[in-house]
């Protein structure tokens, strides 16, 4: 009971006072006592003094304690016997009490009687308690004296109401009250209760608190109910006593209903209660809840606990950090500390409640889970989730799930989490290990928003917690990094990067943990290695102290070891680490406000360290072209992203970049001579050079020298004594040169602009007729030459894409045309050069690992696929080819260039084959910078051709043509997919190279998604221009060809390119607006800007338009394009684009109608035909669009009935190659897609219909009955289609979804029929009769599957038959329930095939008879089963689910 009252402030003070009095009154020594006894003994002849002396107590005067010469029990017994045996008993009692009253008139004497007595016995002889009771307490233990003593005390108490504490700081009223506590027996409890309540009513407030909180120790259990009622009345009258009264009520044995009333009274006052009173009140509320009302109480408590009770005032928040660091505070700091103490105490109360009451913790989680609005979520909610997660291990999974759902839905955002940590860090730091455990769990997710939340938990734990917790955070992050999981490693490194910036001094203390990651470099990617070395270098060179010097030494050791390795993978680690470290060492600190000019500038010693490190890297990599190219790329990245000190930049310009001209640039007038396999020519020059000043890139001779060096074996560079320069380094070296010049000259590239228009020493690249006569080595040489030329041009475009003069723009556009032309030429070579491996374009581990698989693995896949296809063609199958689903073309598994034959079989159209082969080679092309897409702004560009004297000789108009536009859009689309698509949507297959999806995006990966989105938003206007131009192109094309866009007069190649541009633009728009980052508040402005661009295409509006208006206008703008959509795939992207935009709107009903209407238009449109043998519409795309239509249409059942009842009969009555006139997309080839989607959506729809109850209104019953009639009618129409379309995939769909529909009928419809039968007898019987025919057909389908012995169909038969049998039983039960068994006839069925012919097989007859024997019929198509049977069936159905799905994929 005492433990429950820890929160009572008054009691704590009392105990402290008592302890103080005990200490003060302890005897100093026995010698001292004896010396003062003679002078201090009370000399009084009163009966009171005499009887006490006889019984063993000697009263003392002054400051001395009364002395107890005997044991306490012996004294009470002796005095009791003396009083009882006294001749004048019971009058002696009055005399004794009168003597006591006279004695205690003196204040010192009264005080001595209230304080404990001094023991005169030896401690060894004492068998009683170590603490002696006071005289008054001893007298209260004697029954015959107790009533009179209590009366005396209550009469004496008012004298001290308004007196301050005496000189000894002793509170007399509190001492008086304490005498009544823990009495062995209360003689008259009712009288005592009355006296106490009367005293409370007149006592001052501080004494009221003391008396009320002492009640449980004073009163017996029998008085609890009366006291409780009195206190509840007092609670209403005097709100200032709320805390002590509730504290006491929690400790009394009271009726639950009474406590409920009190609790409701308190809940109503909750919003007006002071913070310091809140812990006691919350304790009472939580202790008074029952299992039935817990959720209701907790939900109300959540709402009424305003933030002001749990969050410090704003003026206190600002000083918290100061409090943490200084450790001392002023008077205001004491107030802050008090407020924090109250909050900590509050959460201690809640922790205690949820630890011992499972219902409270579960109700609290449920209350938070039920909160839907973002604004309703509070800091208090997050703290509670953390507390329950750390306190109750059984609810961890539940909380984890709730938290993930809240994060996904955007209800819990970063700002809320930050507020939680900044305000309640003292509460949360005790749960550090649990919070880190939760963060670790969240980082294992595939959802980026959940991963980000987990990383924020680590970040804020490090920021707000103490040193020990910071160490735990770093240790946990290091564990993630060493795990090898790519997403975890990326996230953990990003957090470390933030922590290094956030609190470098704290991170320095934990640097030894980060340094340990150097032992696990094998498992992390190049981009992750960059981050790791950036963290370590920042720690090593931020401050010059002993710890940082140790890190420097270790890093130097690791880097030298890796650089000296002969394995390229380890050399790569050394190069990346060294360049990253050099960047930190040579960083430009001139703008740092904390450094003086002398310290900011790089010293000569530091500059020497940087240059020696870079020279070491250069010397260790120069023997390997790949290593050199990687070094140049890494150095270029460093210059691009980091601001280097001018001294370091100057050294780069003088040492490395000046070597470029010697290595790759020659005079254009001097044609190289040598034994080259092809004649060397200067090609692709943009200027005519008449003088000797012209330059050219010496590409073909360098490539030939490299190939010759390979073939010549050891006798390569040793004989010539010259350093071989690999053409592989051309593009990386130029990138380094360009960025260095750009940084030194503030973006001016005049020094190197000659490289933009200079020619290249090549040979005639157009193969013509000589292609077939070339040797394999010559074709490989030509392929490599074109790859290197393309990479050179791509870097040239990267360099000069942002030039503003028309001449330079024209030249860049010309180079872009050259890239497109060369890709077409390259395609011709690749098609006849099997197993060719291109030269690397990106130099990292991921690329090297995947290179061997690029050709051989895919070639093997094609060969295997070809064998399978040939086998399928030779197999005699009854499945009609028109109903067989074609698989979606998968870009991950595209065949290699070497297999031209297979390509021609699988794909039609030159563009498809070209894009396919180039896609395989994507990893070997240099990456285009995001700035390149500024070219999309170009319309018509006038280029001036100058003569030798710089006079205008002619003008040429250059424009961005469709091929160049498509080239740029494809690259931009791939970049957006890589950066903005959530990882869960692009999950790589099991055991696939983990970095394969990032190949060719290493520069892009160094930017954040926000940066990419911002860059693309700058392109929205030009992309809208291109979209409108393409729209106009197709509109004009349709008008010229009388509405037929693929008529005979159409230029096929141009048409396909424009169509592809259309698709890519829609794809880019979709990827942009589908970005999950828009849900974060900091990105809302980006969304507004993008929508404003779209809406302004229709009309110029104000920038401050509301979101709904912007969404509506944007959708209206995009909807206008639907008439010119050239392909079904474009249509699907347009629909998806509109959907992601409308998701951000609140007008859901109108939005669904818009989507459904547009989807129906696309389904009812005649699309341009592809291959004559089959539709050009992908089955997956058709499936997606049809699902969108049915999910968004107002009535799914009517839509299904229209397709199945109108479209399909039109198809049946049309010629073989024709289609439905209402739905032209419905052909015999696509029928199975329509059938599967309609069956799946029908089953999904009926599962959502609530069964209803007998208590529902008549109108509701009729509406549901009508709905089920429509559903069964649709099901009947669909089922009967298998008589016409009996291909294997159709039958499979019918078996799978037929069973699911029957299950839904049993669960959702049969309860409705139970209580609708009597009122709507005819309707119910009609419904059952229709459904009986359908289930009869399902029974025939089971027989058909068995007789054909197709295992992929027969695996569905047992579960379907069981479901049908349950239906029979359930219909019988329904008829019995309504006393009308004769209303519906149930009988046995014969086994028949789909045409209704009886199956004569004896085995099937016997098995059917056996199966039908126990049930009334084998299946006569009825309703469904008992509830027990349902559960068994469901579990069986779940086991079967996976095999169904895997088979569907193969259909």
UniProtKB/Swiss-Prot annotation:
Residues 248-359 are annotated as: Interaction with BRCA2. Residues 1-37, 868-906, 1396-1451 are annotated as: Disordered. Pfam families: FancD2 (PF14631). GO terms for biological process: brain morphogenesis; cellular response to oxidative stress; double-strand break repair involved in meiotic recombination; gamete generation; homologous chromosome pairing at meiosis; interstrand cross-link repair; mitotic intra-S DNA damage checkpoint signaling; neuronal stem cell population maintenance. InterPro entries: FANCD2 (IPR029448). Keywords: Cell cycle, Disease variant, DNA damage, DNA repair, Fanconi anemia, Isopeptide bond, Nucleus, Phosphoprotein, Ubl conjugation. Residues 1-291 are annotated as: Interaction with FANCE. Highly expressed in germinal center cells of the spleen, tonsil, and reactive lymph nodes, and in the proliferating basal layer of squamous epithelium of tonsil, esophagus, oropharynx, larynx and cervix. Expressed in cytotrophoblastic cells of the placenta and exocrine cells of the pancreas (at protein level). Highly expressed in testis, where expression is restricted to maturing spermatocytes. Residues 1428-1451 have a biased composition (Acidic residues). The modification Phosphoserine is found at residues 8, 222, 592, 594, 717, 1257, 1401, 1404, 1412, 1423, 1435. Changing residue 1401 to A: Reduces phosphorylation by ATM. Changing residue 1404 to A: Reduces phosphorylation by ATM. One of its GO terms (molecular function) is DNA polymerase binding. There is a cross-link at residue 561 (Glycyl lysine isopeptide (Lys-Gly) (interchain with G-Cter in ubiquitin)). The keyword Cell cycle applies. Changing residue 222 to A: Reduces phosphorylation by ATM. No effect on ubiquitination, foci formation or DNA repair ability, but impairs S-phase checkpoint activation. Belongs to the Fanconi anemia protein FANCD2 family. This is Fanconi anemia group D2 protein. It comes from Homo sapiens. The gene is FANCD2.
